[in-house]
UniProtKB/Swiss-Prot annotation:
InterPro entries: Peptide_deformylase (IPR023635), Peptide_deformylase_sf (IPR036821). The keyword Calcium does not apply. It comes from the Bacteria. The gene is def. It holds the Pfam family Pep_deformylase. Binds 1 Fe(2+) ion. Disulfide bonds: none annotated. Belongs to the polypeptide deformylase family. Removes the formyl group from the N-terminal Met of newly synthesized proteins. Requires at least a dipeptide for an efficient rate of reaction. N-terminal L-methionine is a prerequisite for activity but the enzyme has broad specificity at other positions. This is Peptide deformylase. Its cofactor is Fe(2+).
């Protein structure tokens, strides 16, 4: 089981490296990693388990964050209604954004990261809508359209696979700079 001590923090070179593509069929180690990353997200979103194991809540966890430089990330965006199915739940392997909106989007509260132990204020400007192509654990190619929060979460995780951290997208001179067409998501 992945715990907070297993998640590397900013300053570790793996977080700034270009991750390598994952080969199929998945090795036993890659299958275990994928399952463990999803288990972390599930446990971190359960208040009792999060408290028991000292987990920070997360909606995404990329392999580089656990010091494995591979293009794989677990994503679990819960529904607003606790009883509904998650908005998006999958392990995305070798993901590529194949199209995106011109319109930018950002979270009103900014973004956070399990690998960054400090608050960094500012709009993290991303695409409001994306079409994502990836492979699931079975090696099946998937294509999905995402908008708003799920699109932002996936872009954040894909950035990890390319050595980019969320604060790289914040305007250093004016962290809350926004064009008129920016979609702010609360």
């Amino acid at each position: 089981m992945i715990k907070m001590r297993d998640i590397i923090r900013e300053g570790n070179h793996t977080l700034r490296a270009e991750a390598k593509q994952v080969k199929f069929p998945l090795s036993e180690a890659d299958q275990k990693l994928a399952n463990d990353m999803m288990e972390y997200l599930e446990n971190s979103q359960d208040p009792e388990l999060a408290k028991k194991y000292g987990l920070r809540a997360g909606v995404g966890l990329a392999a580089p964050q656990v010091d494995v430089s591979e293009q794989m990330a677990a994503v679990l965006v819960p529904s607003e209604n606790e009883d509904d199915e998650p908005v998006f739940k999958d392990v995305i392997i070798n993901p590529v954004i194949i199209s995106h909106s011109v319109q930018p989007g950002a979270l009103t509260e900014g973004e956070g990261c399990l690998s960054v132990d400090r608050d960094i204020a500012g709009y993290v400007i991303r695409h409001d809508r994306i079409t994502l192509r990836y492979y699931n654990m079975a090696g099946e190619e998937k294509k999905i359209r995402l908008k708003n929060y799920p699109a932002i979460v996936c872009q954040h995780e894909i950035d990890h696979l390319h050595g980019i951290l969320f604060y790289d997208h914040i305007n250093g001179d004016n962290p809350f700079a926004a064009d008129d067409d920016l979609v702010l998501i609360s």
